[in-house]
Amino acid sequence: MIFGNIFLIKWYFKNAKVYVSKEEYDGWINKMPADKNALQVKIMKIIEKQIVQFDFNDTLPLGIKPLKAFGHTPGHTVYRKDDLLIIGDLIHGQDIQFKHPEICATYDHDENASIDTRKIILKYAEDNKLFVAGMHMKYSNSSMYRGFYVKK
């Protein structure tokens, strides 16, 4: 989810909307045991008026298309806009996981789903010749990722 930047959103981007898949929201807030979701519940309460839940068949503002990428979290999402694919937390160690998507970070909630999702999304990116950017990738210039990191 969006835990690290929550106060920036609340204090500096008061008019911002936070788009969260219904599966992600439901997984954290309604299905997760109380002893595991206390922080998420508090954060969602802080920004509840800014949250917009979406379905995966929706197109988000600016023509952004959400794609299912479950495993890291209950409703993890990657986002496509033209030839850019933002993969969020799908990859935590690019030097290892691009070559070995079967290796999981301890943060992945469902390891089997994470592995399957990484394989599917990386193949999708390669087949569609997409630029790939992620939250834990070591370069900030997404153009660095076309082909070179996505191809095996």
Predicted regions span which residues?
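Divalent metal-coordination and catalytic microenvironments
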Residues: 1, 18, 69-72, 79, ...
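Cap/insert and terminal regions of metallo-dependent hydrolase folds
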Residues: 83-152
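Short acidic/glycine-enriched loop/turn segments that link adjacent beta-strands
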Residues: 62, 72-75
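Beta-strand-connecting loop/turn residues
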Residues: 63, 82-83
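Di-metal (Zn2+ and/or Mg2+/Mn2+) metal-binding site signature of metallo-dependent hydrolases
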Residues: 1-12, 75-79
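Activation segment
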Residues: 7, 22, 29, 94-95
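Metallo-beta-lactamase
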Residues: 12-68, 113-129
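Short catalytic/ligand-binding loop motif for oxyanion handling, primarily in non-cytosolic enzymes
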Residues: 3, 28-29, 141-143
